[in-house]
Regions:
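Cell-envelope/ECM-targeting effectors and their regulatory/trafficking segments
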Residues: 1-142
């Protein structure tokens, strides 16, 4: 018998591709009620961060002048244990005046690493223990 969880499970190999992006979107929809489109793409991320993230091999849009992604915004809210409400976060009117940006940053990667008890170097290596830990957690919810 195959359960829904195992049927939708993603690979836990420490490499982030479109499958991990889709899994994260589903995970954020489940735990944050984020209402994200599950398309397997983390949109509009700063190209300057790509060298810091060699473990990301697909499912990301690296651009100059990045506007950010609702998926990363939801993940940042989750990591900070804050409710997700997209319109409020962008203008600073979220809880305690918080602004959650939707771009990947070194502090954001360190926050993800701290969540999993992994050494905080602000990188997503190839392959990455941090990505593998996230993939394992995603599989608990999708």
């Amino acid at each position: 018998l195959v359960t829904a969880t195992s049927a939708n499970a993603i690979s836990t190999d420490g490499w982030w591709g479109s499958e991990t992006s889709s899994g994260l979107q589903q995970f954020m929809n489940t735990v944050m009620n984020a209402g994200l489109t599950v398309d397997g793409v983390i949109s509009s991320q700063p190209s300057s961060m790509a060298p810091n993230c060699p473990g990301i091999v697909g499912g990301w849009e690296w651009v100059d002048g990045a506007a950010g992604s609702p998926t990363i915004q939801a993940m940042n809210a989750w990591l900070k244990h804050l409710p997700y409400n997209s319109p409020l976060w962008r203008d600073g009117s979220g809880p305690r005046g918080a602004i959650l940006f939707g771009t990947i940053t070194i502090p954001g990667i360190k926050r993800l690493q701290a969540h999993y008890g992994i050494s905080q170097d602000g990188r997503l290596d190839a392959p990455s223990q941090t990505i593998m830990a996230l993939q394992n957690e995603i599989n608990q919810y999708v």
